[in-house]
């Protein structure tokens, strides 16, 4: 969950998000080292009037500043490609949920069950209970079992939307007439908040997403109650 004055990412709640955080730190360190080197060179050039005649036409320097950027790009590209393939990998999902974007709410359908689905609307500010978050709470949460692969099928009924939950490392575009898919594994129990991440009209800011990860037995009890009420 994000909080005021936060400078970093939200706490990771899935293996993919943990990998993304590690890659961010890895890339940021490379950027920091390059920036430090460039700043040192600029300060050295400005602070002295002396000129080294041996570097005016140095083949060694030409070789270094050609090879070094190539090595840096490889060091960034390899972990990036690894995470890219991890995000696209969907192996034997235990649960499949279809998320449909509407103006301006989400609807969810648990395709492994015969009649388990619901619409999820934002809770108005005046109806919030103590401790709930403004513009982030919904009347129905998307409940998933923790430590289980969950596949999300994402589409839209009207215009472009985007289903995104930062703590889970998930962001998938919802395109009318197209079915996109992604997957995640919630590594710990908790309530994780997200929002529509594609401008979709006047009430774009009022399309929150709430994912609640619970132990498997709690999920089975919840699904049984939902099926009884259907």
From Swiss-Prot:
It is an enzyme of class 7 (translocase). It catalyses: 4 Fe(II)-[cytochrome c] + O2 + 8 H(+)(in) = 4 Fe(III)-[cytochrome c] + 2 H2O + 4 H(+)(out). Pfam families: COX2, COX2_TM. One of its GO terms (biological process) is ATP synthesis coupled electron transport. Binds a dinuclear copper A center per subunit. Residues 46-59 are mitochondrial matrix. Gene3D superfamilies: 1.10.287.90, Cupredoxins - blue copper proteins. Cu cation A2 binds at residues 196, 198, 200, 204. GO terms for molecular function: copper ion binding; cytochrome-c oxidase activity. GO terms for cellular component: mitochondrial inner membrane; respiratory chain complex IV. This is Cytochrome c oxidase subunit 2.
